Every structure is written in C-alpha cells, then in structure tokens.
Amino acid sequence: MHLKASLLDENAIRRALTRLSHEIIEKNKGVEDIVLVGIKRRGYPLAERLSEFIEKFEGVKIPVASVDITLYRDDLTNVSDTPNLNDPKIDVDIRGKKVIIVDDVLYTCRTARAAIDAIMDQGRPEFIQLAVLVDRGHKELPIRADYVGKNIPTSKDEIIKVQIKEIDGTDSVEIYEN
C-alpha cells in the first residue's frame, strides 16, 4: 500500500466542518431539538467539533452522543473471529429529536445502516440525517449523506485514510493504492 495523494489537511478539514455546521443550521432552520450522534471511533470527535462550531455560530450547545455499531454490523464475522462487543446504548434521549449521524467516511453505507438500526432501537427520532467528512462512492445500500465535507470518487482498490487529531494526533485525509 502506498500513498497516492494527500487530499485534506488540518485547515481543509476545519473549513469542511465549518461549512457542514452552517448547512446543518440552514437545512434544519436553526438548532432546536438537534442531537449529533458520532459513530465510534472517528465519527464521535467529528460530531464534537460540529457541535462546537454550531455553538460558536448559534450560541446553543448541541448534545453529542456516540454510538457503537458493532452489534449491528452485518459483517461481524468478517471483522474479527472474536469481535469486541460493546453496549450500543446512546447516552442522550433521541426520542422525537432531529438526529444527525456523523461519520468520517461513507463507502458502502453498511456502517450508516448499522447506526440507523442502533438509533432506532433506542427510540423513535423525529428524523435521521447523515453527515460525513468524506463520501467516496461505491454504495451498496440506498443511503446518501445529507451533508458531505468532500466527495472523493475512488476505485474499490483505493483506501481512504482519515486521521483525526483527537485519536491520531493529526488531522488529514489521504488516499492509498493497494
């Protein structure tokens, strides 16, 4: 696997998240009843950052929760022989709320589908939207993101690597070839 290109640096990621924050506010006509739910691992810190930007623009703190979708994956046995199964409980009441799922990369849509299932098991939100930093195409399910930081068309042989400062010590999006 070798680096093909660096696609987003720290400044580009910050600009993308700033734009996504404005789009979320505009599309929802404000921030009332919005809950951001970040998919573990990298979706959660992105959701926290979106919440910070929205608070900066609107003066309102948006609740942020995380969801572990491990139990909801349809490829659980492909991930590991002994997967780490965590409680998928979301620590924010999402019933009747405008839930926005946040993730780093949208690829096949299977992770997004698992997150939707996990959220619906916690209660019935008013609606669910999806925000992603990168949409790389190759969807296998009829799911699309409502908010996209960057569309990056890829081949199935390419790998998108997202690094988030809170987890990886740096912010970047890179594309690799196998």
Curated annotation (Swiss-Prot):
Motif PRPP-binding per UniProt: ranges: 99-111
Domain of life, per lineage: Bacteria
GO BP annotations, alphabetical order: DNA-templated transcription termination
The EC number(s) this enzyme carries: 2.4.2.9
InterPro entries: PRibTrfase_dom (IPR000836), PRTase-like (IPR029057), PyrR (IPR023050), PyrR_bifunctional (IPR050137)
Positions contributing to substrate binding: R41, R42, D103, D104, V105, L106, Y107, T108, C109, R110, T111, R136
Pfam families: Pribosyltran (PF00156)
Catalytic activity field: UMP + diphosphate = 5-phospho-alpha-D-ribose 1-diphosphate + uracil
Catalytic EC class: transferase
Keywords: Glycosyltransferase, RNA-binding, Transcription, Transcription regulation, Transcription termination, Transferase
GO function terms (MF aspect): RNA binding; uracil phosphoribosyltransferase activity
Annotated family: Belongs to the purine/pyrimidine phosphoribosyltransferase family. PyrR subfamily.
Record text on subunit structure and interactions: Homodimer and homohexamer; in equilibrium.
Purpose: Regulates transcriptional attenuation of the pyrimidine nucleotide (pyr) operon by binding in a uridine-dependent manner to specific sites on pyr mRNA. This disrupts an antiterminator hairpin in the RNA and favors formation of a downstream transcription terminator, leading to a reduced expression of downstream genes.
Protein name, as recorded: Bifunctional protein PyrR
Highest classification ranks of the organism: Bacteria, Bacillati, Bacillota, Clostridia, Eubacteriales
